[in-house]
Amino acid sequence: MASNSSSCPTPGGGHLNGYPVPPYAFFFPPMLGGLSPPGALTTLQHQLPVSGYSTPSPATIETQSSSSEEIVPSPPSPPPLPRIYKPCFVCQDKSSGYHYGVSACEGCKGFFRRSIQKNMVYTCHRDKNCIINKVTRNRCQYCRLQKCFEVGMSKESVRNDRNKKKKEVPKPECSESYTLTPEVGELIEKVRKAHQETFPALCQLGKYTTNNSSEQRVSLDIDLWDKFSELSTKCIIKTVEFAKQLPGFTTLTIADQITLLKAACLDILILRICTRYTPEQDTMTFSDGLTLNRTQMHNAGFGPLTDLVFAFANQLLPLEMDDAETGLLSAICLICGDRQDLEQPDRVDMLQEPLLEALKVYVRKRRPSRPHMFPKMLMKITDLRSISAKGAERVITLKMEIPGSMPPLIQEMLENSEGLDTLSGQPGGGGRDGGGLAPPPGSCSPSLSPSSNRSSPATHSP
């Protein structure tokens, strides 16, 4: 009995109950659990030669059945069933799989990853209970991120994923030489040139001052406001020209170009004016040479924003940024994939990556003994965004204080800014009257759109 059991055919031997099994039996688990058809063994026995025994030995069956493998073909492998995922837990769009612990679409996956990796802090300008779905998901980043957490997306999964990638592709940071490659050098020069052509250095300006309200702070000096708003309009035009010269910017969709310009224009204006700060006189100089002290800046329209801007200017002084660094930092502020309502945020991120690399290499090559300067510069973007958010709020109050309407280009720059929607249709203070503001006849101010056939600024919403 023992010898018989040891020679019984097994699945590993390629047979089961006298029937041939495919060479790769693990591909066909249903076959391994099945029973042989009735009479199969009897039929096989009749086909075997009789050599004095009424019942052939198991070894004989194994030998014969092996020769029949060539006769009985293996059944074809059934096609795998397509995986069906639940809709995205965040916005109910079509899911692409399980990401960071939940079923999610590509858009919400990328948004959550960028938010965690960049430690983004968002603000809700409503009641922190915005409806998040496929249509509204880009309208409030704060509520979208909260929804990600509510449905179970994990911060740790993002960090672990990032650490895993770092382990798979180790980067020897300590061995980096920070050599300027021709490609990086060319990119830096293009950005430097774009910055210099649209923003002359302080040493190139013929400074002049005014005695208007230079001693005491008031709510608003109308003469200073008129001058300040005129200069601000010119600065916005120069910022648009700067953006057009940045490599790859005009390859983005028109809607994304407008979105990026509107989102970052105030950041760039503040960064630029702060590089023209003179600490000895506590003054700032505009592009036409007009130099205002802190009190005059307050009275010109900065109001409660004044001290924040001057404090930021003081923080820039130790960085000793040159034109290339200021231009690159401005470009990084502008070309940023986490801005609201972008159509192609991943493409914007791809354009930003070489700018970040160029700034890192340039800063560390220029200051080899101060490796901390690059992250310090990047952190200034967070400060800029904080000041800009307060700047947008200041524009709201300004619209109520100025006697006329807001200049059309300033109006367009903040047309869709967060927090300004509440003013739509409100009377007084130059607020929009449903139809919006059209530029004055013969105005040469371009709109924020890089295309030349745009309609009037107030009638276009990207």
UniProtKB/Swiss-Prot annotation:
Looking at the record, the residues that make up the NR LBD domain are: 183-417
Zn finger limits (NR C4-type):
88-108, 124-148
- Outcome, altering I396E: Abrogates interaction with NCOR1 or NCOR2. Increased affinity for NCOR1 and NCOR2 in the presence of BMS493. Increased transcriptional activity in the presence of agonist and decreased activity in the presence of neutral antagonist
What does the UniProt record report as the effect of altering S219A in this chain? No effect on heterodimerization with RARA. On ATRA treatment, localizes to the nucleus, and increased protein levels
- Motif 9aaTAD, which positions? 408-416
* Region annotated Disordered, chain positions: 52-77, 419-462
Which InterPro entries does UniProt cross-reference here? NHR-like_dom_sf, NR_DBD_RAR, NR_LBD_RAR, Nucl_hrmn_rcpt_lig-bd, Nuclear_hrmn_rcpt, Retinoic_acid_rcpt, Znf_hrmn_rcpt, Znf_NHR/GATA
Q: Which GO terms describe its cellular component?
A: actin cytoskeleton; chromatin; cytoplasm; cytosol; dendrite; nucleolus; nucleoplasm; nucleus
Q: Where in the cell is it found?
A: Nucleus; Cytoplasm
Which positions in this protein are listed as binding all-trans-retinoate?
Answer: C235, S287
The conditions that induce or repress this protein are given as: Expression is induced ba retinoic acid. Down-regulated by aging. Induced by pulsatile shear stress.
Q: Where is this cross-link: Glycyl lysine isopeptide (Lys-Gly) (interchain with G-Cter in SUMO)?
A: K166, K171, K399
UniProt modification remark: Phosphorylated on serine and threonine residues. Phosphorylation does not change during cell cycle. Phosphorylation on Ser-77 is crucial for transcriptional activity. Phosphorylation by AKT1 is required for the repressor activity but has no effect on DNA binding, protein stability nor subcellular localization. Phosphorylated by PKA in vitro. This phosphorylation on Ser-219 and Ser-369 is critical for ligand binding, nuclear localization and transcriptional activity in response to FSH signaling. Sumoylated with SUMO2, mainly on Lys-399 which is also required for SENP6 binding. On all-trans retinoic acid (ATRA) binding, a conformational change may occur that allows sumoylation on two additional site, Lys-166 and Lys-171. Probably desumoylated by SENP6. Sumoylation levels determine nuclear localization and regulate ATRA-mediated transcriptional activity.
- Indicate, by first and last residue, each region the UniProt record lists as having compositional bias (Gly residues): 426-437
Give residues where Phosphoserine occurs.
S77, S96, S219, S369
Q: TM segments?
A: none
Query: Where is region (Hinge) located?
Result: 154-182
Q: Name one Pfam family in it.
A: zf-C4
Q: Which GO terms describe its molecular function?
A: alpha-actinin binding; chromatin binding; chromatin DNA binding; DNA-binding transcription factor activity; DNA-binding transcription factor activity, RNA polymerase II-specific; DNA-binding transcription repressor activity; enzyme binding; heterocyclic compound binding
Residue span of region Modulating: 1-87
Motif UBR5-degron in this chain: where? 254-258
Example of a GO biological process term:
limb development
Q: Please give the clinical condition linked to this protein.
A: Chromosomal aberrations involving RARA are commonly found in acute promyelocytic leukemia. Translocation t(11;17)(q32;q21) with ZBTB16/PLZF; translocation t(15;17)(q21;q21) with PML; translocation t(5;17)(q32;q11) with NPM. The PML-RARA oncoprotein requires both the PML ring structure and coiled-coil domain for both interaction with UBE2I, nuclear microspeckle location and sumoylation. In addition, the coiled-coil domain functions in blocking RA-mediated transactivation and cell differentiation.
Q: What is this protein called?
A: Retinoic acid receptor alpha
Q: What organism does the UniProt record list as the source?
A: Homo sapiens (Human)
